[in-house]
Amino acid sequence: MSGKRVVVGMSGGVDSSVTAWLLKQQGYEVIGLFMKNWEDDDDSEYCSTRQDWIDVVSVADLIGVDVEAVNFAAEYKDRVFADFLREYSAGRTPNPDVLCNAEIKFKAFLDHAMALGADTIATGHYARVREAGGRFELLKAFDHTKDQSYFLHRLNQAQLSRTLFPLGEMPKTRVREIAAEIGLPNARKKDSTGICFIGERPFRDFLNRYLPTKPGPIRTPDGKTIGQHIGLAFYTLGQRKGIGIGGSRDGNGDAWYVARKDMAANTLYVAQGHDHPWLLAHTVHADDLSWVAGHPPAEGTQLAAKTRYRQADAPCAVTRATGDALTLTFQQAQWAVTPGQSAVLYDGDICLGGGIIASTEAASLEQAVA
């Protein structure tokens, strides 16, 4: 690969640092690019942007690559954060990492890299790209425990054709070993968590800065009022902690879970017990679809899906896939399927794409106990 120029998204973390080193070893001309996609945190105790940039520069000096910083804060707010707030305001629970990958890391970043004369880009994501018959497939990572294809399912053929995922073929333990072996200064740095580019702030405090609170009743499925919520945007389906109603009511010690939101009545419904029927769904409807191959799978196809990150693949049938509407029917009832999250389809290790969960249909009693 001598002479090929690759621009690597370097975050200051171990994964992107090892990615840059591996590509340098393979003969690529490597340029590191540090993305700053959030502006309002420079004085925050939760901000790590400055330290991340210091780590990027230290790694670049050690492995001998050029590095520069680019500010995509305006693009992030317009393309990702505005949608994030709209979804929460509508009572849904979005996954901004999915949109951030499609709009920032593999669009704004890719465009910038091409302007730098890059032949390709690379990131530290755990996933794989395979060319087959002139088309590109997105595959799960070799290390399924770290697989990030769920977050990448909106990537298209043009994006995948210009993308490398060097870590996709190795376990995370080996990445840490390489970092230590070559003496990376961030070899022991913990993996980042929290919302994409927003960090590890207490989420409720962060959201409260942008969305107004509108308290309302908390009710049980039979309509009994048992508390007051602070605003529907601050709760998500399946949530157990932080509801504020205690752990035992109606003579039953089972935990309470957020089960439904009635936006029109500003009412939060909670159900008692992990396997309450209100928490189970057999059919999932999604829209805002995106397919890696550019077209949906055929109706009637038996596949598997994830309706949240780190969920085990769940067998399902594609019962509708026309236009911008997708319906999945699962063999077994799925727990706390949440509107706003992504439903992502897989054929074995191949990630086909998916869409944003719009609504669900409750499981029957037989399906609920299966």
Curated annotation (Swiss-Prot):
Residues 95-97 are annotated as: Interaction with target base in tRNA. The active site is at C100 (nucleophile), C196 (cysteine persulfide intermediate). Pfam families: tRNA_Me_trans, tRNA_Me_trans_C, tRNA_Me_trans_M. GO terms for molecular function: ATP binding; tRNA binding; tRNA-uridine 2-sulfurtransferase activity. SUPFAM superfamilies: Adenine nucleotide alpha hydrolases-like (SSF52402). One of its GO terms (biological process) is tRNA wobble position uridine thiolation. Residues 146-148, 308-309 are annotated as: Interaction with tRNA. It comes from Ralstonia nicotianae (strain ATCC BAA-1114 / GMI1000) (Ralstonia solanacearum). The record marks H125, Q341 as: Interaction with tRNA. Catalyzes the 2-thiolation of uridine at the wobble position (U34) of tRNA, leading to the formation of s(2)U34. GO terms for cellular component: cytoplasm. Its EC number is 2.8.1.13. Belongs to the MnmA/TRMU family. It is an enzyme of class 2 (transferase). Keywords: ATP-binding, Cytoplasm, Disulfide bond, Nucleotide-binding, RNA-binding, Transferase, tRNA processing, tRNA-binding. The lineage of its organism: Bacteria, Pseudomonadati, Pseudomonadota, Betaproteobacteria, Burkholderiales. It catalyses: S-sulfanyl-L-cysteinyl-[protein] + uridine(34) in tRNA + AH2 + ATP = 2-thiouridine(34) in tRNA + L-cysteinyl-[protein] + A + AMP + diphosphate + H(+). This is tRNA-specific 2-thiouridylase MnmA. It is found in: Cytoplasm. The gene is mnmA. ATP binds at G9, M10, S11, G12, G13, V14, D15, S16, M35, G124. InterPro entries: MnmA-like (IPR004506), MnmA-like_C (IPR046885), MnmA-like_central (IPR046884), MnmA-like_central_sf (IPR023382), Rossmann-like_a/b/a_fold (IPR014729).
